[in-house]
Amino acid sequence: MTLYDVIIVGGGQAALSVAYFLRRTNRSVLILDAEDAGGGAWQHGWDSLRLFSPANWSSIAGWPMPSSGEQYPSRDHVVSYLRRYEARYSLAVQRPVLVTAVEPRDHGFAVKAGDRSWDARVVVSATGTWRNPVIPELEGRSAFGGLQVHSAHYVSPSAFQGLRVMVVGGGNSGAQILAEVSQVAASTTWATLSPPAFLADHVDGRVLFERATVRWQAIQEGRDPTDLPGGFGDVVMVPPVVEARARGVLHAVGTFERLTAEGAQWADGTSRTVDAILWCTGFKPALQHLESLGVVSDNKVIVDGTRACDVPGLWLVGYGEWTGPASATLIGVMRTARSTATEIDQYLTAQVLA
């Protein structure tokens, strides 16, 4: 039986970042990735997906993302970068391994994937959110007779040619998908809970990272980060979204009250007939593998930083604000990955000395 010091569940940017910093500790580390190949959830992004920050603002630790020759790197460029990163640092990865359970043992944990099992003193959960897309439970959703697709499974606008399409969700994915679908659809409706907030044309995702930095500093100083101005939901005006604005497409209506067989109905009695709904309604953390530990509540685990409070030896990285400001982004996960690796090394050293 091989007993690893650390097993990292997940193979995307968060997993690679933690593994990079753990290289400096000479601990034995194994990454278990559910995907068939490297690249994390980026390889499931839609065909035209691009970052909304330049390559030099979209790197993980150690090796800067090479320039793509374009203002904003494409999905395929990001996937290639992550695969090359993995090879560059000779990170130990087994795939495809879909971890189904993490169970406590005297030595630490047994990490299960069907009838296979691995043993580790420490487990880092870095599975992200892609495998847990959210579609709100709304009246009439099952009665709607048209096409329903979550952004997790959206590929290209070709499937919506000539259709009356409703895009639900006011974030970056909603705006970007609306922009390209509106070029081929018969009509589009953009339904959002609140009016979308747009960044100025001359700024990009770097502003969001700078906001995250200010919030991180506030947390380190014991200040309340919720009192700081600016959020992370603002829509970045990438070229396709700017072009859609020029066509008058970026007009959002309030969210509807219910769905019908033919479309949607609002609280004021107005209704719209649509053939397809694109749910750009986000994701929740993919934590199903941790349910066996009894620590998952409301799709979260109680953490101090990234360390699970109720399970010694468990850390969670890259799930968003509750595991660190901007920790679900390429450049933003660096801080929490570094601190996580340091804490793990200290934890394992203390175990030996105990």
Task: Describe each PLM feature range.
Residues T2-G11, L16-E35, G39-A41, E70-A354:
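Flavin (primarily FAD) cofactor-binding/catalytic cores of flavoenzymes
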Residues W46:
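Glycine-rich loop at the start of a catalytic domain that most often binds anionic cofactors/ligands
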Residues L49:
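Histidine-centered active-site microenvironments of extracellular/periplasmic hydrolases
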Residues F52-E70, I219-E221:
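Glycine-rich flavin
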